[in-house]
Amino acid sequence: LPSPYNQYTINLTDPRGKDLHELIPNFLRGKNFDKSRLWNKIHYDGPAWVTNVSRPFVPDKGLEGCHLSLWASHGRYFNGKQWEWQRPYLFCTTEDLFTQTIVVPFLIPMLEHAGAVVFTPRERDWQPRETIVDNDIHTESGTYQETTHGAKWSDCDTPGFAPSQPTLKDGENPFRKGTARQIEATSRHSKLASATWTPCIPQAGRYAVYVSYAHKDNNIPDAHYIVRHKGQETHFRVNQRMGSGTWTYLGTFDFGLGESPQNCVILTNESEHSGVVTADGVRFGGGMGNIVRGCSTS
């Protein structure tokens, strides 16, 4: 710059006030790279988020213990006037639809069979029916029950899930609209207790099972969930120290029609750790979109 401007310090910013120098990638920064952008150590040695303890094998290599976030492409969004696909139509389909036909039935199971825990914010279950059983609202969707033997259930002092009635508007978080329950964990048989979610299945078929729970500083890392599907039982250990305030996927199972003790989810307070077990809503099936924008839903 010509004099006298070469004596000035010039800062370039975008409309949001962000310094444009921050947009320079580390690859072009030479020795003055930004350490805050580095992954550093990402290996996790703690208990997995979800462990199927009924599976007949435990991978000793592969992706065992790894946690992956995976999106099955894009989806529908509200453009200010209507809901539409994010990607353009091409050869009678869109990326939003076509890619998930590869990711959901093939890629996700492959990663899970190799030992990984896969979290996908986009719904993975194509079951259009949905049943939610929650401690806050007793409806025809199912029944929530608690049993106590020495230890007692109580309300959490942190928010929990409550089913939306019937839709969600902008800014609403269903995981902060209700309450959750808690109980002390124990290894003593005399103090064992349980919570049971028994759904009223609208049509026999395969349904994904999701559980939710509240965050507490002393949550245990091995909450014991039992999924009873057509009388068979599959046992899980869920690390409640992570993943609270969302739907935690356990698996997809065959369920019979109607409400039956042969189709339910059970959570016990049995644990090898001291702390609390928290219980909230349980969802069966993927369902349909219920987000309101304008005068229509997703």
Task: Set out the residue ranges of the language-model regions.
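Non-catalytic propeptide/linker segments at domain boundaries
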Residues: 1-74, 79-86, 285-297
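Active-site histidine-acidic residue metal-binding/catalytic motifs
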Residues: 54-151, 293-298
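Short beta-strands within extracellular/lumenal beta-sheet-rich domains
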Residues: 178-201
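A short beta-strand element within beta-rich, extracytoplasmic domains
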Residues: 193-217
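Short, surface-exposed beta-strand/strand-loop-strand elements in extracellular ectodomains
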Residues: 215-234
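Extracellular carbohydrate recognition and processing domains
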Residues: 230-259
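Extracellular beta-strand elements of beta-rich domains used
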Residues: 250, 282-284
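Short beta-strand-plus-loop segments that form exposed binding edges in beta-rich domains
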Residues: 265-276
